[in-house]
From Swiss-Prot:
Signal peptide: none
Name of this chain's protein: FMRFamide-1
The keyword Secreted is annotated on this UniProt entry: yes
Superkingdom per UniProt: Eukaryota
GO CC annotation, single: extracellular region
Amino acid sequence: QPSQDFMRF
């Protein structure tokens, strides 16, 4: 489950 997918630079 992509929980911290917002950290994809």
